[in-house]
Amino acid sequence: MAPIKVGINGFGRIGRIVFRNAVEHPDVEIVAVNDPFIETKYAAYMLKYDSTHGIFNGEIAQDGNDLVINGKKVKFYTERDPAVIPWKETGADYVVESTGVFTTIDKAKAHLQGGAKKVIISAPSADAPMYVMGVNEKSYDGSAVISQASCTTNCLAPLAKVINDKYTIIEGLMTTVHSYTATQKTVDGPSAKDWRGGRTAAQNIIPSSTGAPKAVGKVIPELNGKLTGMSMRVPTANVSVVDLTVRIEKGATYDEIKQAIKEAAEGPLKGVLAYTEDDFVSTDMIGNPNSSIFDAKAGISLNNNFVKLVSWYDNEWGYSRRVLDLLAHVAKVDASK
């Protein structure tokens, strides 16, 4: 199958990292980008130089209002209204909606007016069907607007699926120790709804909320209402880690649980879930393409029915790679109909 042609709306952290990943993805070709807040020259600069992921591995140039990536022209638009972005003219059948603004079906479907056939929201959505690769992508129903949930959900869900399928989760608590993101402050500033969230990101550990456990209940219905959790925002630029503590129905030793996760990582969830016994720290995970990297040495169990599991994720790179994998899956299903 020829590479699917994709447009990106929103050239922030996820938009640019999706683009970088797409250069390496055989099934995807980025043909257009839209961002109303930056000009083409600046977009080229931000794509080329990245403080976390380094210099772009390829050639970037500008031709008028367009980007030229490794000799291929990529249309660049600066429209504020997604309904007027001419996706059809560019050949983009699929759009990655990565502004963080148009996260409902009603808002995201505006892209269809410009000629896009499908929209994938790279964020949680209040009403769009959510799919997580390795967990529930096979239930894709052809909806025109879908969500890939959050980076934390993409880390948590595969791990929870393995444990629930094998041992049945009774209940659980999750904490994500999460790197700071663009919505946080470089210095203390106003944040009316979340006072602590307005404190400087580089100096503080900041308790916060996360919708990831609730989202897991949507992609794994058997876990609906069984998980809840929180976030601790920490002063690191990238890579986060999930701490999942669960009570399980079928008792198992920690070694048995590790083996079950290892088998899943080397089998049906390969490329989504990984297993390691190395003594990693967070920066070692930068650029890791997996959604969830289970740290066998970091977990502990109190007894055979109560266990804490730890799993890393590059909240930018790994998540962006799954966006492309979900796109490829959706396109394959669409083509078979």
UniProtKB/Swiss-Prot annotation:
One of its GO terms (molecular function) is glyceraldehyde-3-phosphate dehydrogenase (NAD+) (phosphorylating) activity. Pfam families: Gp_dh_C, Gp_dh_N. It is an enzyme of class 1 (oxidoreductase). Signal peptide: none annotated. It is found in: Cytoplasm. D-glyceraldehyde 3-phosphate binds at residues 150-152, 181, 210-211, 233. Keywords: Cytoplasm, Glycolysis, NAD, Oxidoreductase. Gene3D superfamilies: Dihydrodipicolinate Reductase, domain 2 (3.30.360.10), NAD(P)-binding Rossmann-like Domain (3.40.50.720). NAD(+) binds at residues 13-14, 35, 80, 315. The keyword Oxidoreductase applies. The record marks 178 as: Activates thiol group during catalysis. The active site is at residue 151. Pathway: Carbohydrate degradation; glycolysis; pyruvate from D-glyceraldehyde 3-phosphate: step 1/5. Its EC number is 1.2.1.12. Homotetramer. This is Glyceraldehyde-3-phosphate dehydrogenase. It comes from Colletotrichum lindemuthianum. The gene is GPDA.
